[in-house]
Amino acid sequence: MSEVTVRKMREADLPAALRILGLWNMAPRPPSADVPDPERSGIELANAFVAEADGRIVGTCSYFMLGDDWAETASLAVDPAFKGGGVGALLQAARLDEMRHRGVRHVRTETDRPETIRWYVERFGYRIVGTNPKKHTFSLPDVDYWTVLELDLSAN
């Protein structure tokens, strides 16, 4: 596998990042009459990362601030050809490092994929704190709720 590097997202990276998110049914969508408050309506470029291999974007993730010391992760996705190669862990580590440097102490994550829930708990020390109903079909179409996880960054 090619060497993978993680860096901050640039505007020119958006089409590739959106393509990868779309592969997992996680692309942001604008508000509409049918879905006035979508799960994700955009990507905050200042808080977004990409993983790159051989000049090609192979993964993306971001986060947004909920308060001075609270943040929520947003849509980590990896090109299926690179799944299982550690790209997701590199992206997650980059965003957690940046959050720590910004003074974030508490991180919230929502996911609907059982393997991703296990990954967050076992690899990063998250704990499951509840569920939230989905606003519309996003990510897995047959799951109508998010599992909510939290991570105490001050303990790591």
Regions found by a protein language model. Give the residues of each.
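Conserved N-terminal entry element of GNAT/NAT acetyltransferase domains
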Residues: 1-12, 153-156
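Acetyl-CoA-dependent GNAT
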Residues: 8-12, 19-74, 79, 92
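Alpha-helical elements of the RecA-like P-loop NTPase motor core of helicases
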Residues: 15, 117-118
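Short, well-ordered beta-strand micro-motif
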Residues: 50-52, 148-152
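Conserved acetyl-CoA-binding loop-helix of GNAT-fold acetyltransferases
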Residues: 84-97
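Conserved GNAT acetyl-CoA-binding A-motif
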Residues: 99-112
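Conserved catalytic-core motifs of GNAT/GCN5-like acyltransferases
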Residues: 108-110, 121, 125-145
